[in-house]
Amino acid sequence: RMKAGTADTVPFGFFKKSIFDTIGLFDERLVRAQDYEFNRRIIKSGGTVWLNPEIQVVYYNQPTLWLFLKKQLLHEAPYNAYMWYLAPYTFVFRHAVTGIFFLGILSGSILSFYFTWIKWLFFSVITLYTMLALIASIRQALRYKHIIHLFALPASFFLFHFLHGFGLVCGISKLLFGRAPVQKHDEPWEAAGRVRSFQVHNR
C-alpha cells in the first residue's frame, strides 16, 4: 500500500495561493507536463510536494488503447523533451528510459545482423524484458482476476514503451532542428516578470 510522504510530483495537486506569488504560475508553453514542471519548481525553490493516498479522485482515461498510445506518441512523450529544454531542473533519468529503450531496439535490430556479440546482448535484453513483462502481467491478472491481462499486458507494455520512446526521440530531434513548438523567449505565462527569473537562474 502506498504511504503518505514527500514526492517529486503528484497528479491533480492542491496548492496554496501564496505559492503562485512566490514561484509563478503554470508554464503555458507546455501543453503537457505543466503540473510536473510546477511541482519540480516548488521543490527547487525549497518547498515540499506531499502525497496523501487517502485523497481519492475519479480519473477518466482514454477510451481505447489506440487513443492512449496516440496521446503518448504525439503529446506526452515529445513534451517531456520540451520540458527538459525549458526547465532543465525537471529532468529525471526514468523519463528518458523509454527513449533509450526505443534506440536500443532500433539499433540492436540492425546491428545484430553484423555483430555476434550484439546479437546475444540484444537477445538477452529482450528475454529479460519479456520475463519482467510476464511477471508484471501475472501479478495484475491475479490481482484483478482477469486472465486477459496475462495476454494483453505484455503487448501493451511493449507498445507503450516503444511508442513513448519514439515520441521522445522525435521531440528531441525537433528541438535540435529548431522545429519544436516551444521557445525559451516566449513568456511562460502572461506578465511573468521577475518570477520568470527562477527558470533562468535555477538550471
Features from the language model and the residues they span:
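Soluble, non-transmembrane catalytic domains of enzymes that act on hydrophobic metabolites at membranes
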Residues: 26, 31, 37, 41-44, ...
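Short linear elements at protein peripheries
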Residues: 174-203
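A cross-family signal for key residues in well-ordered alpha-helices
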Residues: 21, 40, 44, 103
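Short, flexible, basic/aromatic active-site loop/helix in glycosyltransferases
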Residues: 1-12, 21, 81, 86
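Membrane-embedded multi-pass helical conduit in multi-pass membrane proteins
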Residues: 100-177
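Short, well-ordered alpha-helical scaffold segment located
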Residues: 18-22, 56
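Catalytic donor/gating beta->alpha subdomain of glycosyltransferases that bind UDP-sugars
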Residues: 27-91
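Select subsegments of transmembrane alpha-helices in polytopic membrane proteins
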Residues: 91-99
